[in-house]
Amino acid sequence: MEPSEVPGQNSKDNFLEVPNLSDSLCEDEEVKAIFKPGFSPQPSRRGSESSEEVYVHTASSGGRRVSFADNFGFNLVSVKEFDTWELPSVSTTFELGKDAFQTEEYVLSPLFDLPASKEDLMQQLQVQKAMLESTEYVPGSTSMKGIIRVLNISFEKLVYVRMSLDDWQTHYDILAEYVPNSCDGETDQFSFKISLVPPYQKDGSKVEFCIRYETSVGTFWSNNNGTNYTLVCQKKEPEPEPGKPLEEAPSKQKKGCLKVKSSKEESSETSEENNFENSKIADTYIPTIVCSHEEKEDLKSSYQNVKDVNTEHDEHNEKELELMINQRLIRTRCAASEYGKNTLSSDPSNIPNKPEELQKNQSHSEACTDLSQRLLSPGSSAESSLKGDFYHTEKYSSGNESSHQPSDMGEINPSLGGTTSDGSVQLHISSKEILDDNANPAHGSGRGEISCSFPGQLKASNLNKKYEGGAENSEMKDCECLPRDVHLKASDYFKKSTENRPSEEDYGTSKDNKEKRIQLDVDEKTSKNFRSIFYDQERNVGHLEITVEGIEASDRDLTSLPTKDTTIPTWAIMEDTFHSSRTPLGREEAVLTTPEHDLSSSEGTILGGLTGGVCSPRNGNVLKNDYLFQVEKRKSGWINPEDQNKDTQHQQSWNVLESQEKARGSKTNIAEQIKEQVDCEDMWEKRDNTGSLKATPAEALFTCQEAEHCELSPLADHGIPGKAEAGTAYIIKTTSETTPESMSAGEKAIIAKLPQETARSDRPMEVKETAFDPHEGRNDDSHYTLCQRDTVGVIDDNGVEKESHLDICNARLDEMRKEEAMSMHSPGKMRDREKLGIGNITSVEESSQVIANNEKATSRLDLHLEMPSADKKIFPENRDLGQVQELSKKTDIDNTVHSAFNSDTNRASRDDSLLSSHHTETSVLSCEQANAVKNTVTTTALQTSATESEYNCSPTRETQGQPASKPEEVSRGSRRVTSETRKEKCVGQMFQSGECNVEMSQGPMILVSESRENVERERHENEGLINSGDKEFESSASSSLPVQETQDQSNESLLSKYTNSKIPYFLLFLMFLVTVYHYDLMIGLAFYLFSLYWLYWEEGRQKESVKKK
């Protein structure tokens, strides 16, 4: 083994540690390499003293080591290596020492200003949430200690200082430490330290940093108002001392020794001088260095006396500063500007070092006062009221040397130069709030003072609401736009606030109405204020109608602003205002809804006027069709006094109807609704233009029902559009007041537009599906009775007249045309159909007309349909059965009158029976309808147990919902068949129709047409059906026959059934006794139990079969 290798190893016994030194140098070089890419300030080089000591040891031990090598007989190769290493080591060592000494010749100079006073600091802190409060530069090093003050937003908080040495290409974060006992309840303090290490100690190098404040609420940044906090490394030129001139030593080592000796003395002096220069540059708060206000001599000559002078004048300076601050506050009535604060700090250390700076600051303060006086125009009421608000904007109102005004406040003052002081203050406050909102996302933003009296203020508030958190520069520029644009923005804003409501508000409580009314009031007031200032522009602008356009009818008391060009569309209200899940009716209403005062003022808009005030969803208690009917009557000039008395009645019935619509109405097809509404509107416009109120009954019924908005698709959208449109066009009918009070609301207002299953489940009647299937093969188009509004067959004594009104929202035009052709070419066949109650196409329409005159017979929904005046004359007098019969005869005589009881009463009863065949209660309803026609309001509740609404002209479910059209349909069907000759035929054919055989209720037939004797006769004929236990017959009999007789008969039948059912049990018991007597008790008991089980099972089967039947 070679001893030359032993020194290369890490051995504590060896004194020669040359390899270790080389390794350490390599490590230092590696550290430098690491510094360059990452700019990490962590490790520092080894001190000069340590390196020199190492060098001394190596030099002294070098000879010894060589001697040791020679003594042991080792080769001198290792010595040669040592010699080659020694030569560069000398120069390297002293270069390092030189670098180490040069680090003390660099200082950090700040390029930023700190808050001059506590008040200014707190003001900025409210906005930015974190601020650099003070800095301290460590003497003799390129390092800075800083204190950050943060707003105490949340308990958990972290403060980082992010710094970069290469213009933010790379950066790293320094975690600031909490200063103990620094919390004052509102703020906290954190400290940090930035050091510039030798590799980056270059003249002109910059250190940029900013502050990141992390809280549970959010993260906030402070970067010196967008310019970053910047430190510049500058080389400090050392000043030679007079008594110790530097010697020009020939050797580097000697020169280095001189420096080492003088470095400690110079370091203290140079560090103090450097700090003094720093105070001149930055005007920052450095507690160790104090500059005197009376400093007039040369700084170098008087440096030793500075501290004494400052201690003598401490109290004097404080008094002077207080006096100056008080004078300036009294003079300006606002806080001094940022520059004034820099000059007028309460701390003597921040007094300007030079008189020029003091004059400069005074000029800035004067500029601030001038600007504030300009802001405070002569019209300001109290200047002192602006003091607090101006604090928030003072630093932005005047120019700033550093030119770091916030972008959001830059242009407020110029834009409001001519406005009053109140306006400026209001805008300052709103802008301040915007800053707070931007800085702190937790607080809700969008504050705006609408109550201000001048327009600029309202502009600012609207801008605040619209552009929260955005760049406020653009907003303030927008303030200077034309008044007309601002007016448009404000009105748009209020329109949005009015229209953009959740769908529940369409049917909301009165609280919603109040809120909306208040909002509209505010809109009106602000609009009036606008008009007072910008009246010229506003007269040419029609946008104020927005404030009225989207308002429901419940807000009718609010009047729109009476501008010249304000034209409010009558029925073009947006459907979005009322879009909701209300019912098809609600949607349809919304399409034609307008404020009522607009409708009343505009005579030309008939459709809007008719539907406007009534159709809004919140006024559901008002019968919209009543309003339509009344307005139309007023225009036409004919009004039935009985109809006037019925207004309140129909309004009440409409409430019940609407409630059931909500419960049973199915979802509607919006596209079909809109299409049908357009068609209906066209129809209304035609009718309004022509003014023909004496149209045929079919047209009258159809147009009226269109006005009711009970269109086909909304009521019949069950996946079978054709069927639904055909069958369930106009189902909504309300019963007359003949129905007893004991009846439920569902009975009083029946919506026939239900699925067949629903109809069966909701009502005790059965509906034959064949009646509803248009493709079932029936040559009578009864299932389209309501839809076929264009075919109106009126049969007089002279013959059959055919009037067709085509293209009026027809569900199936082709089938109707076929039916029209059939009815025109085969009047006899149509008569047969009428006998069966199928051909009563126009009966519904005519019935609504006839009953319109009967106060207690039907609701006004059918009355809306324009009836011929002759029809009205028919039914006001219907009081008795005899009168009903007389009326039927009169209608036979009057060909012009297209109303109810022209035809045979038997035929009417047969029509009723047809209806009863389709649902069990129809017979009862038909009886009631007959009673309603007779106006027998005093009939017992049992007789009128079913509502008239169940009585339908046609057997289809479509007719189920037309409560008022029953007797009229009967009469109309009879009317179609020419007079009395056809009556007789109908009497004979009553039971001949196969569809009417069992379910035909003779009672209703009798009530409608025949005398009391006929009623009794037909009642006896129906007794057999009553005994059968059929619900349909029981309901019809109960409505037509005396209640006591029907009850007696039913009691007898029940008694007989009960006794019959108990006979088998009695016989079984006898058999049990016999078995027990002859056989064992257990056997008899088992046989008895088995027999009982079998009997119960059989009886249950029988009951099920009966139910099915």
Swiss-Prot record:
Residues 236-278, 340-424, 436-455, 493-517, 945-985, 1011-1048 are annotated as: Disordered. Phosphorylation at Ser-48 by ISPK stimulates the dephosphorylation of glycogen synthase and phosphorylase kinase. Its main location: membrane. Pfam families: CBM_21. One of its GO terms (molecular function) is protein phosphatase 1 binding. The keyword Chloroplast does not apply. CDD domains: PBD_PPP1R3A. Gene3D superfamilies: Carbohydrate binding type-21 domain. It is found in: Membrane. Residues 340-352, 360-384, 396-406, 951-963, 1035-1048 have a biased composition (Polar residues). A motif (PP1-binding motif) lies at residues 64-67. Keywords: Carbohydrate metabolism, Glycogen metabolism, Membrane, Phosphoprotein, Transmembrane, Transmembrane helix. The modification Phosphoserine is found at S40, S44, S48, S51, S67, S843. The modification Phosphothreonine is found at T58. The chain crosses the membrane at residues 1066-1086. InterPro entries: CBM21_dom (IPR005036), CBM21_dom_sf (IPR038175), PP1_regulatory_subunit_3 (IPR050782). One of its GO terms (cellular component) is protein phosphatase type 1 complex. Residues 236-251, 966-985, 1011-1034 have a biased composition (Basic and acidic residues). The keyword Nucleotide-binding does not apply. It is a single-pass membrane protein. Skeletal muscle, diaphragm and cardiac muscle. Residues 124-232 form the CBM21 domain. Seems to act as a glycogen-targeting subunit for PP1. PP1 is essential for cell division, and participates in the regulation of glycogen metabolism, muscle contractility and protein synthesis. Plays an important role in glycogen synthesis but is not essential for insulin activation of glycogen synthase. Interacts with PPP1CC catalytic subunit of PP1, and associates with glycogen. The CBM21 domain is known to be involved in the localization to glycogen and is characteristic of some regulatory subunit of phosphatase complexes. This is Protein phosphatase 1 regulatory subunit 3A. It comes from Oryctolagus cuniculus.
